[in-house]
Amino acid sequence: MASNSPMRRIWILVVTLWLAAGVSCEKRHNKQIDPELASLGSAEITGQIVEIPGEFPANDFYNYAYVLKYRVLKVHRGQVNGSEIFVAHYNPLKPRATVADEFSGKVGGKVERFRAGEIHRMALEEPLDKFWMGGIIDKYFENKGTRYWAVWTNPGEP
């Protein structure tokens, strides 16, 4: 085949499309659920952070849990009370992959930092005070309702 022949161009186009389709399908099928999400907690949800009420304090002197408000987008297992819930995250300035310590119990995930509007897939436990007895910053204290403990937090999709 000549280097610029129509057959060669068609052959290259077919191979390129075939490879692109294979890569596209691989990405779709590679979305496996994190086994920690599927096994930890009594509920698993996808939720969007409604707001972060203030800045997170530094972890210089003590460990704490910070309560964030989430809009529930989907409940994957278990149940939660309402379409908006309050979720406490342990030491939210630390990436979830390195946050666990001798005080927290098993917590973790793949979220690097928390920003309003982000979507997270989380394994949750309730009530908060059954899983965390340390400092709690809850700027929603006037709002009644369950406070959930975020056991595992990964980035999520709508």
PLM feature segments, named:
Residues 32-35, 109:
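A structural connector/turn signal
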Residues 64-158:
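Disulfide-stabilized netrin-like
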Residues 26-28:
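Bacterial signal peptide processing site
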Residues 41-60, 66-69:
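Structural detector for short beta-strands of small beta-barrel domains
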Residues 2-11:
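Bacterial N-terminal signal peptides that target proteins for export
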Residues 12-19:
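Hydrophobic helical h-region of N-terminal Sec-dependent signal peptides
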Residues 21-24:
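C-terminal motif of bacterial Sec signal peptides marking the signal peptidase cleavage site
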